[in-house]
């Protein structure tokens, strides 16, 4: 029912599972080759995920207590901003953003690991004190090829809803060279989330 990065999502015995695409075949059921392939698929579906060698760093935005101390917005910058904020809260649910982002991040971690990714969590509890610069440093040192930050924006205007992604501009002095790849990934994430949930697609904001 789906395929990507060498893995396929298949329906097997009324269950959805992920297997390496190399195990799939168009051989007619009942043949000896089809039997061997099915056995391999069952073993893969029941066994531990096979690593695909890729690392993803996930940052659950904010934390229980903000840190108003200042730090540069980028290496060597004279522009300063608060190290980290505690975030907002749901207009209706009153759920703190830092709790929501950690919950979503843990679910994303599980899904990615099931698909063979190695996941580095920037934080795994709400009671931490990690500045934005420290979070970026952890991600950089992890060797991750993808760094995803999870946030949940909030407005007093309850008519505003949907999902958006943010990425840097092409003229960003620190990582503008990654703009094209970052924009492409951001768009794919937003499009996929909205397709799966029915949320309004608010696109990619370059900032």
Predicted regions mapped to residue ranges:
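Conserved beta-strand/loop element in small beta-rich adapter and peptidoglycan-binding domains
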Residues: 1-5, 40
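Extracytoplasmic/secreted cell-surface and envelope-processing proteins
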Residues: 18, 66-68, 128-132, 155-160, ...
């Amino acid at each position: 029912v789906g395929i990507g990065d060498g893995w396929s999502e298949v329906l097997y015995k009324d269950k959805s599972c992920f297997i390496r695409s190399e195990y799939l075949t168009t051989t007619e059921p009942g043949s000896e080759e089809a039997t061997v392939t099915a056995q391999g698929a069952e073993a893969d579906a029941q066994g531990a995920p096979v690593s695909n060698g890729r690392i993803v760093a996930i940052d659950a935005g904010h934390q229980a207590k903000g840190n108003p101390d200042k730090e540069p917005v980028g290496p060597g910058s004279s522009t300063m901003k608060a190290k980290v904020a505690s975030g907002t809260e749901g207009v209706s649910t009153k759920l703190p953003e830092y709790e929501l982002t950690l919950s979503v991040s843990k679910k994303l971690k599980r899904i990615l690991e099931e698909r063979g990714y190695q996941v580095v969590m920037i934080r795994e509890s709400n009671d931490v004190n990690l500045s934005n610069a420290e979070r970026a440093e952890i991600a950089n040192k992890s060797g991750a090829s993808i760094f995803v930050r999870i946030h949940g924006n909030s407005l007093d205007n309850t008519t505003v809803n949907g999902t958006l992604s943010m990425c840097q501009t092409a003229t960003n002095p620190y990582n503008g060279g990654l703009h094209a790849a970052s924009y492409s990934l951001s768009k794919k994430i937003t499009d996929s989330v909205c397709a799966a949930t029915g949320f309004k697609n608010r696109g990619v904001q370059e900032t």
